[in-house]
Structures are given as C-alpha cells and as structure tokens.
C-alpha cells in the first residue's frame, strides 16, 4: 500500500505545483492591468511630455536623414 501512495503522491504534488504557478501568473497579470492615474495638467507631467516629444522628434529626424 505504501508503494501505491508514493507513486501517486508525486503526481498529486506536481498538479498542485502547476495550480500555484497558474495563480501566480494571474496575480502578475492583474498587477500589470492596474490602472495608474496620472494628472495630465501637472507641470511636471507637461515638462516630461515635452522632453519625450523632443527626443522622439530628434530620433525621427535622424532616422529620416542618417547623414546628419
């Protein structure tokens, strides 16, 4: 009887381990989907947006004219 239990026990443990991994994946997915509230009228946000836009424009310009 003990042999039978040892043979089925690893499979049961393995299935439980897979369920735990699945739950961990769902928690991680929920964290990624969490909505972040950013104040778009804040001066810091506007300053950051202008900096990002400027860098992007320079990148596009270099991409379009690589000789410069």
Curated annotation (Swiss-Prot):
Belongs to the PCP4 family. InterPro entries: Calmodulin_Regulator_PCP4-like. It comes from Homo sapiens. Residues 1-16 have a biased composition (Polar residues). Keywords: Phosphoprotein. Residues 1-45 are annotated as: Disordered. PANTHER family: IG-LIKE DOMAIN-CONTAINING PROTEIN, PURKINJE CELL PROTEIN 4-LIKE PROTEIN 1. Residues 45-68 form the IQ domain. This is Purkinje cell protein 4-like protein 1. The lineage of its organism: Eukaryota, Metazoa, Chordata, Craniata, Vertebrata. The modification Phosphothreonine is found at residue 8. Residues 18-31 have a biased composition (Basic and acidic residues).
